[in-house]
From Swiss-Prot:
Pfam families: PyrI (PF01948), PyrI_C (PF02748). Belongs to the PyrI family. GO terms for cellular component: aspartate carbamoyltransferase complex. Binds 1 zinc ion per subunit. This is Aspartate carbamoyltransferase regulatory chain. GO terms for molecular function: metal ion binding. The lineage of its organism: Archaea, Thermoproteota, Thermoprotei, Sulfolobales, Sulfolobaceae. It comes from Metallosphaera sedula (strain ATCC 51363 / DSM 5348 / JCM 9185 / NBRC 15509 / TH2). The gene is pyrI.
Amino acid sequence: MIELKSGLLVSKIRNGTVIDHIPAGRALAVLKILGIKGIEGYRIALVMNAESSKMGRKDILKIEDREIEEKEAELITLIAPEATINIIKDYEVVGKRKQEIPQEVVGLLRCTNPSCITNNDVEAITRFRTLKRRPLQLACEYCETRLTEDEVVRQILG
């Protein structure tokens, strides 16, 4: 539930997903990860730059009649590590999960090194290990090329 001092800003959803604690300005990137363009028929509430005692400012997404898949949650975690994913059934939170940035990211991102084997062998699957969680820094297992958080966000946004 998103509340203002004067009351409710966005109504509750009956069934679906609420993603809270998204860093301010990244909710549109989360929608892109989910492949939501606005024509799918989902009712979506998007709040950007909401006040947050924990984060200063944050974004919030409510998506009615849609649950987040594990692979989507992993990608969301890479650009919104503090995000909380709430599953809603009959207006109640029935599941709440906070993803951890994985130790290894497999097949989700591409290596930026044009000489890397993953860019020259169609069967090679990208594999990055997490070097730092904040700010995010990943290293390619094959060529050691490093990806920063900004590069990860750029790749996800395509």
